């Protein structure tokens, strides 16, 4: 017979009571009412915040965007194939954020900061909110330092400064991305962190950009954020904000950064798709009413910070694709009004062989002039005006039979200037080379060079200066001015190259 020992029973009960954990885990949970087209309608989630991350049963994440009386509209950031009506949804209590660290340089990441280049995890100890407030007025400083693109026509006529927002706008296949990639390549050795955001592009195009940057040695200081055409609309909408957050993390550490949004037209289309599926009222061109705010809050994050804030900067080059050159459409006019100038690329100029196909007449930089280096400012002051006058004269000369000598001379110089400004892709020029080319054209030193040999002259002049006159290159690159000594060397070099070319012709 088993003997009952009361002391043992009481000891076990005391042990059980002491180990009892009465804490209750409370989580904000809802139920899926409807799912489809990347949108979920969820009942419950009473305590959810606007923009909060929610987690579905199958592990898919979403963002709560519409907080209505009886349900919550959430956009999915994944396929969501395992989600069905009645599935549970859990609020995470977190707003969308992205991990940031120096280890991101040279990597390709998703809009949530996850690596997608097969090189393993990215170690990081801190994260930044994807949506954060732009620096205030007191935290800023006026744009005063140049950001050289390496493209002569831009650096001489439409200069860009650190902290500026300069729009690149044009039809498809006019070289918009090429200008952006050239600008990244030209930052080599300049201690500028670059972020390239690809929105709604073909995965093959993004892979091509990565390969070009790797070949040119530019991937080491570049982060690529990719949301390709096959990704959900929510990720395409988030990608530019992720790019801005990554750039901000470097900017607030006192570094100069450059962000390229390629392109914001596709981001607006992804946002339109989400808004219409969430049953928000459509406005002009079926875009929602807050599509202006979509872009303004993104581009306002670009800034040149004050000395007290560490003097960092974030320069933004948003890209917009137009339809048949129509810059008066809704999204182009919105972004033109937000940015500090635009570089307009024309398909007619592109097809006529002018690359980069920049329409100088309607391209403008509203603040970059203050940041332009003295060397190029001194000689390029009249360049834009001369080219604009040449365009007018060229149009007029088509109808005139006999032109006077002065007009013919002006037309000849205009044509040579046009030829000088042609530049191959992925071959940015340094400041000294740009100064030499523009000087030769503006001062009329190549008026005797045959028009079809101007490109050859430009190439030979650059080679001659590098091999025979390195002191000129060093002087202009370090001092950023074209003083009398440098000008004398340059003039002699131009005449030398010109003489040898004309003699061999």
UniProtKB/Swiss-Prot annotation:
Pfam families with a match to the protein in the record: ATP-synt_ab, ATP-synt_ab_C, ATP-synt_ab_N
UniProt-annotated site: Required for activity, residues: 363
Taxonomic superkingdom: Bacteria
Official protein name in the record: ATP synthase subunit alpha
Principal location class: membrane
Binding locations of ATP: 170-177
EC number: 7.1.2.2
Annotated keywords: ATP synthesis, ATP-binding, CF(1), Hydrogen ion transport, Ion transport, Membrane, Nucleotide-binding, Thylakoid, Translocase, Transport
Subcellular location: Cellular thylakoid membrane
GO MF entries: ADP binding; ATP binding; proton-transporting ATP synthase activity, rotational mechanism
Assembly: F-type ATPases have 2 components, CF(1) - the catalytic core - and CF(0) - the membrane proton channel. CF(1) has five subunits: alpha(3), beta(3), gamma(1), delta(1), epsilon(1). CF(0) has four main subunits: a(1), b(1), b'(1) and c(9-12).
Topology versus the membrane: Peripheral membrane protein
GN (gene name): atpA
Summary of the function given for this chain in its UniProt record: Produces ATP from ADP in the presence of a proton gradient across the membrane. The alpha chain is a regulatory subunit.
EC supergroup of this enzyme: translocase
Keyword field contains Membrane: yes
PROSITE patterns: ATPASE_ALPHA_BETA (PS00152)
Entry keyword Hydrolase: no
NCBIfam families per the UniProt record, alphabetical: atpA, PRK13343.1
Catalytic activity: ATP + H2O + 4 H(+)(in) = ADP + phosphate + 5 H(+)(out)
Species per Swiss-Prot/TrEMBL record: Prochlorococcus marinus (strain MIT 9313)
Family in the record: Belongs to the ATPase alpha/beta chains family.
Cellular component GO terms held in the UniProt record: plasma membrane-derived thylakoid membrane; proton-transporting ATP synthase complex
Disulfide bridges in this chain: none
């Amino acid at each position: 017979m088993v003997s009952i020992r009361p002391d043992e029973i009481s000891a076990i009960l005391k042990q059980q009571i002491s180990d009892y954990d009465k804490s209750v885990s409370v989580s904000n949970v809802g139920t899926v009412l409807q799912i489809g087209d990347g949108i979920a309608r969820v009942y419950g989630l009473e305590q959810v915040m606007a923009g909060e991350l929610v987690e579905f049963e199958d592990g898919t994440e979403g963002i709560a965007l519409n907080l209505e009386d009886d349900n919550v509209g959430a956009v999915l950031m994944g396929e969501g194939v395992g989600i069905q009506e009645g599935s549970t949804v859990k609020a995470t209590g977190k707003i969308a954020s992205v991990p940031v660290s120096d280890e991101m340089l040279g990597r390709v990441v998703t809009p949530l900061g996850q690596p997608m280049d097969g090189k393993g995890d990215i170690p990081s100890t801190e994260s930044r909110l994807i949506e954060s407030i732009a620096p205030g007025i007191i935290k800023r400083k006026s744009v005063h330092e140049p950001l050289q693109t390496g493209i002569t026509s831009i650096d001489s006529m439409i200069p860009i400064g650190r902290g500026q927002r300069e729009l690149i706008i044009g039809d498809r296949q006019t070289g918009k991305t090429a200008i952006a990639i050239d600008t990244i390549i030209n930052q080599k050795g300049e201690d500028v962190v670059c972020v390239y955001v690809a929105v709604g592009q073909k995965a093959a195009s993004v892979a091509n950009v990565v390969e070009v940057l790797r070949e040119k040695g530019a991937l080491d200081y570049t982060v690529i954020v990719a949301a390709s055409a096959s990704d959900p609309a929510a990720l395409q909408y988030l990608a530019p904000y992720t790019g801005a957050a990554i750039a901000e993390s470097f900017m607030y550490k006192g570094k100069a950064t450059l962000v390229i949004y390629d392109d914001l037209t596709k981001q607006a289309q992804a946002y339109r798709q989400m808004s219409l599926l969430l049953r928000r009222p459509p406005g002009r061109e079926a875009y929602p009413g807050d599509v202006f705010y979509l872009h303004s809050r993104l581009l306002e994050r670009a800034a040149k910070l004050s000395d007290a804030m560490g003097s960092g900067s974030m320069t933004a080059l948003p890209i917009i694709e137009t339809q048949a050159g129509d810059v008066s459409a809704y999204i182009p006019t919105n972004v033109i009004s937000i940015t500090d100038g635009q570089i307009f690329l024309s398909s007619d100029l592109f097809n006529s062989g002018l690359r980069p196909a920049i329409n100088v007449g309607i391209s403008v930089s509203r603040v970059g002039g203050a940041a332009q280096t003295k060397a190029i400012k001194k000689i390029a002051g009249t360049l834009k005006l001369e080219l604009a006058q040449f365009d007018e004269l060229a149009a007029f000369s088509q109808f005139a039979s006999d032109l006077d000598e002065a007009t013919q001379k002006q037309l000849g110089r205009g044509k040579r200037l046009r030829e000088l400004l042609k530049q191959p892709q992925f071959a940015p020029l340094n400041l000294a080379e740009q100064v030499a080319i523009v000087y030769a054209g503006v001062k009329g030193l190549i008026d005797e060079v045959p028009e079809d040999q101007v490109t050859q002259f430009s190439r030979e002049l650059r080679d001659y200066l590098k091999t025979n006159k390195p002191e000129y290159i060093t002087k202009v690159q370090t001092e950023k001015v074209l003083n009398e000594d440098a000008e004398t060397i340059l003039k002699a070099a131009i005449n030398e190259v010109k003489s040898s070319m004309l003699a061999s012709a």
